[in-house]
Amino acid sequence: KGDSYYLQDESCRVVELYLAEDGVGLTDTWPTGDGRVLKVEFFVEWATDVTQGIPAGTYKVVARDEESKGIPREFLKPGGIASGYPNVFTYPQGTWYEKISNGTMKEYARIDGGTMTVARDGDKHTLTIDFIDCDKAHPHHVRTTYSQDTPINVFGSHP
C-alpha cells in the first residue's frame, strides 16, 4: 500500500488485508454484496514485497491518541495493527469488522485491541486472529483462523 501515514522516512509500510465471505465483492473501491468482511490495516518493514505474502509473526493492535484519534508516531512500526478510527462510517479507517447487505454496512465492530498471528509455510499462510472491539463495558471478540495454500491476492489500491 505505501506511506499513507506520511512518515516520510521509509520506516514502515502500511498494508490493508480484507478477509471476506464469498458473497462479498472486493474489486471496487469499497466492498460490495452481502456477507461479512474483516479489514485489517497493519504495518510491515518498508522493504517488504507484499506480492511475496505477509511476513510471519505476531501483529498487535495499537492504541490511538485519546484527543487527536491519531496513532502516536512511536506505535507506527512493523508488527503493529492500526486500531479502528472512531466514528467514521462512510469509509472506516484502521481495522474494522463489518456485516454488509447490498454493499451497505449493517453491523460493525471497531477493533480496539488484540492480535493477528501469521504463520508461513512457503506460499501457505495461516492467520490466527483474536481482536476485541471498542466496547469497554461489554467487549466482544472477533476471532477467526484463515488458511490459504496459494499466495494472498494483492491489490494496487483499495481494497
Name every feature range the model reports, one short phrase each.
Residues 44, 112-116, 126-159:
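Edge beta-strand at a domain terminus
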Residues 7-117:
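Surface-exposed helix/loop patches within compact recognition domains
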Residues 81-83, 88, 123, 138, ...:
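Alpha-helical protein-protein interaction elements
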Residues 6-7, 76, 90, 132, ...:
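Compositionally biased, low-structure terminal segments
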Residues 13-16, 122-128:
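Short, hydrophobic/aromatic-rich segments at coil-to-beta transitions
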